[in-house]
Amino acid sequence: MDTDILKMQDREVFEAIALETGRQMETLELIASENFTSRAVMQACGSVMTNKYAEGYPGKRYYGGCEFVDIAENLARDRAKKLFGCEYVNVQPHSGSSANMAVLFSVLKPGDCIMGLDLSHGGHLTHGSSVNFSGQMYKAHAYGVDGETGIIDMNQVEKMALEVRPRLIICGASAYSQGFDFKAFREIADKVGAFLMADIAHPAGLIVSGLLSDPMPHCHFVTTTTHKTLRGPRGGMIMMGKDFENPMGITIKTKNGQRVKMMSEVMDAEVMPGIQGGPLMHIIAGKAVAFGEALRPEFRQYAMQVRSNAAAMSERFLSLGYNIVSGGTKNHLMLLDLRNKDITGKVVENTLHEAGITVNKNMVPFDDKSPFVTSGIRIGTAAMTTRGMNEDDSRLIAELIDRVILSAASPESSSVCRSVKEEIRSLCLRNPLEGYGVTPS
């Protein structure tokens, strides 16, 4: 990566970037929400598109001079529609959280009832957590997983929906290693007259590759991030399989009177000017590049390897005596319940960091520890697979993590971490990140 100008102009920022580059190149990234973009995506994100304000949408901007950024946004929209098989898409949300906010604002009033997966059972802050706007503006009710299987209890979901009569049901997760039965969720939503929103931020890359069930035929709204398993720049997106007249009765004036707005019009207005102003056109250009990459046949091979690596790693953890919530994985991640190892997620996260392995502590279902301590760790295989690692590497990584955990409370912990860190560094250098080289001075 060419950073000569930055190095001359701002040495402090250059050094920070160089050090972070070294960390990414020589340590193992296993945080499930992280991945490595292509150089083409990074070049688009670092392009002159960052200089252009473009409030509004292609062909209907509030600023002049938008004819070329319109090309980039139309490419992103058209490619996303082809990739996900949807009729409507908005690529302007700055994040998955802002995409979720736009959907909630478009169909809910303050005080309306919503349902989402419990944060401690693998859900997300924007699905009704009390510390988030979604749990503060709305009456949020959380469904959870079965205590024995670790899988979402659809009977509980239906019972709760019939009791609280939500306006919106959210199906999605940030730490759930199984798929979602979108058809069953839609049947429940229809019984109570609720909207259904799927948040596929984590498994989107696997879904577009046909490896997990497709939410488009069943959900009114689908949101996602554009990084994680999609391997694009950090950002969000809103989709609808089919557009429809908004059931809230919102109208728009026409030459002949007025008409009911389509839901796509309501959603676009909620994104801009509802919660955002100018879109990040350099990021939208990067999204277009990433969607183009995901449309290629080799992306499906990548997604298949991500899932295969996760399966191999989870099976090795199980054979080493670890408990995995839900008993295994069908996607790119796994949630290790460490309670039978008598160690906390916080300790494991910190100790693995010393060994050159990055994970995040994570609450497990029915956890009795705080979110700052936790009884589990979340592990994902999207980033390591981008480096070219395979099933054998995945099993080796599980064994190295086990070595670190078993020694964490012993006097040998530091020496074990040093030894594992060297093995991890060698593994990473055998599977390099092409074109990421920035050397600190």
From Swiss-Prot:
Which Gene Ontology MF annotations are present?
glycine hydroxymethyltransferase activity; pyridoxal phosphate binding
Q: Which residues bind (6S)-5,6,7,8-tetrahydrofolate?
A: 119, 123-125, 370-372
* Classification via InterPro entries: PyrdxlP-dep_Trfase, PyrdxlP-dep_Trfase_major, PyrdxlP-dep_Trfase_small, Ser_HO-MeTrfase, Ser_HO-MeTrfase-like, Ser_HO-MeTrfase_PLP_BS, SHMT-like_dom
Q: Which UniProt keywords apply?
A: Amino-acid biosynthesis, Cytoplasm, One-carbon metabolism, Pyridoxal phosphate, Transferase
Q: What does this protein do?
A: Catalyzes the reversible interconversion of serine and glycine with tetrahydrofolate (THF) serving as the one-carbon carrier. This reaction serves as the major source of one-carbon groups required for the biosynthesis of purines, thymidylate, methionine, and other important biomolecules. Also exhibits THF-independent aldolase activity toward beta-hydroxyamino acids, producing glycine and aldehydes, via a retro-aldol mechanism.
One CC-aspect GO term: cytosol
Compartments, as annotated in UniProt: Cytoplasm
Cofactors that this protein relies on: pyridoxal 5'-phosphate
* Biological or metabolic pathway of the protein: One-carbon metabolism; tetrahydrofolate interconversion; Amino-acid biosynthesis; glycine biosynthesis; glycine from L-serine: step 1/1
* EC assignment: 2.1.2.1
Q: Where is this site: Plays an important role in substrate specificity?
A: 227
| CDD domains, per database record | SHMT
Positions of modified residues (N6-(pyridoxal phosphate)lysine): 228
Q: Which reaction does it catalyse?
A: (6R)-5,10-methylene-5,6,7,8-tetrahydrofolate + glycine + H2O = (6S)-5,6,7,8-tetrahydrofolate + L-serine
Q: Does the keyword Repressor apply?
A: no
Q: What is this protein called?
A: Serine hydroxymethyltransferase
A Gene Ontology biological process in which this protein takes part is: glycine biosynthetic process from serine
The record's note on quaternary structure and interaction partners says:
Homodimer.
Q: Which family does it belong to?
A: Belongs to the SHMT family.
The answer to whether the entry has keyword Membrane is no
